[in-house]
Design a protein with these regions (language model features):
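Conserved acidic donor-binding segment of nucleotide-sugar-dependent glycosyltransferases
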Residues: 297-308, 316-321
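A short, well-ordered alpha-helix in the C-terminal region of glycosyltransferases
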Residues: 323-338, 347
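Aromatic "clamp/platform" in nucleotide-sugar-dependent glycosyltransferases that forms part
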Residues: 246, 265
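Short His-centered aromatic/hydrophobic patch
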Residues: 83-90, 107-110
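N-terminal strand-loop element at the rim of the active site
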Residues: 3-4, 8-66, 142-147, 225
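A short, active-site helix/loop in glycosyltransferases that binds the activated sugar's phosphate group
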Residues: 130-155
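Short hydrophobic beta-strand element within catalytic cores of glycosyltransferases
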Residues: 282-285
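A conserved mid-protein helix/loop that constitutes part of the nucleotide-sugar donor-binding site
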Residues: 15-26, 185, 189-208, 225-231, ...
Length: 365
């Protein structure tokens, strides 16, 4: 039997999708699959896909003829092409036009837009969903959305990511000292600084807990177009919040926190939630998307956009060490029941085999 050849296509490369592709590439290569990763060069510099044994081809995140032609050339000879995200799937569908190569799309996250942009987003969702032979989604609500948008075959496929490396208690002490939270509670949030991640609501909540003694420090790791607006609010309102930008070793910073906070408008299998529960860090998150089915009873859930409920929950947990300890243990137990990387890779490989077999002979590429 000839070696299965796959191409993984990434667009902008969010942390979750990029980590997933890195994990997937390593696991597939270990199982004898030939893997090519197509992504913008900056994504490879951050995730080093060649270290997994995959071949890397730089393809810009554009839909102009040159970029589509480069992607089409990269997909020559592939048995299955797997696009990660809406934009990547739409561009890949263009690149595969006229070829009988099955396209798999993992719909990693839900996007939001208003007015004319909403119409454009709906069109993109329909094109991507209908172009794919199989749509994989990490949460039930995304499976439902894919079907609404016309997907021929949409399946629930929880995405497992590699567990973060931990430096232990010494590393946690160093992290707290670096952040200025040695003698005060440390709250940690991670994500791109864009509206749907809800950091404006988080700043509203910080106005409440700044009355505590000692005052908790909220640290937000990430970059994005809202940084200047958030920084301006932090300065003008004198909020106990620090924006630290994109950082290596965020897992170590998270492990040092007293609480992890996830205020998003929507999340699937949130990378922050997974890392927090695995590390035994109590999590306060919004009850949106795939979060409730991911965390079960092992986290405190609040409504999206309700700063008062978020602040009240944080204040209560900071004053209740026993409840934080219970949540930490419940988180570890919940995480132990999640699909492993091996489970995820085996499931994806079974989809590839299913799609590639009917086309194994007599196909013109």
């Amino acid at each position: 039997m000839s070696q299965l050849r796959t191409v993984q296509v990434l667009g902008g490369g969010s942390a979750g999708s990029s980590a997933h592709v890195g994990s997937l590439a390593a696991g597939l290569v270990a199982r004898g699959v030939q893997v090519t990763v197509c992504a913008p060069p900056a994504v490879d510099r951050a995730y080093d896909f060649t270290a997994t044994g995959a071949r890397f081809l730089p393809v810009p995140r554009r839909s102009d003829p040159a970029a589509v032609a480069a992607l089409r050339a990269a997909c020559t000879g592939a048995d299955v092409v797997h696009a990660h995200g809406l934009h990547a799937a739409a561009r890949t569908a263009l690149a595969l036009s006229g070829r009988a190569v099955p396209l798999v799309m993992t719909w990693h996250t839900r996007r939001y837009a208003e007015g004319a942009r909403r119409q454009i987003l709906n069109l993109l969702e329909r094109r991507a969903a209908r172009a794919a032979a199989v749509v994989l989604a990490p949460s039930s609500d995304l499976v439902d959305l894919a079907r609404e948008r016309g997907a021929r075959d949409a399946r629930l496929a929880p995405v497992a990511v590699p567990p973060p490396r931990s430096e232990g208690t010494d590393g946690e002490g160093k992290a707290r000292a670096e952040l200025g939270a040695v003698d005060r509670p440390l709250l940690m949030a991670v994500g791109s600084l864009v509206p749907h991640h809800g950091f404006d609501v988080l700043l509203d909540a910080a106005r409440v807990w700044r009355s505590l003694d000692p005052v908790p420090l909220l640290v937000i790791a990430g970059e994005g177009r809202d940084r200047n607006a958030l920084q301006r609010r932090i300065r003008d309102e004198q909020l106990p919040v620090t924006l630290i930008g994109c950082r290596d070793g965020v897992g170590e910073l998270l492990a040092a926190a007293d609480l992890a906070l996830l205020p998003s408008r929507w999340e699937g299998r949130s990378l922050l939630a997974q890392e927090a529960l695995r590390a035994g860090v109590p999590l306060v998150a919004t009850a949106v998307g795939g979060v409730p089915e991911l965390v079960g009873r092992a986290a405190e859930l609040v409504p999206y956009g309700n700063a008062e409920a978020l602040a009240r929950t944080v204040v209560r947990l900071l004053g209740d060490p026993a409840e934080r300890a219970r949540l930490a243990e419940a988180g570890r137990v919940q995480a132990a029941g999640w699909p492993t990387e091996d489970d995820t890779i085996a499931h994806v490989l079974s989809v590839y085999d299913e799609l590639a077999q009917p086309l194994a002979t007599g196909r013109v590429r």
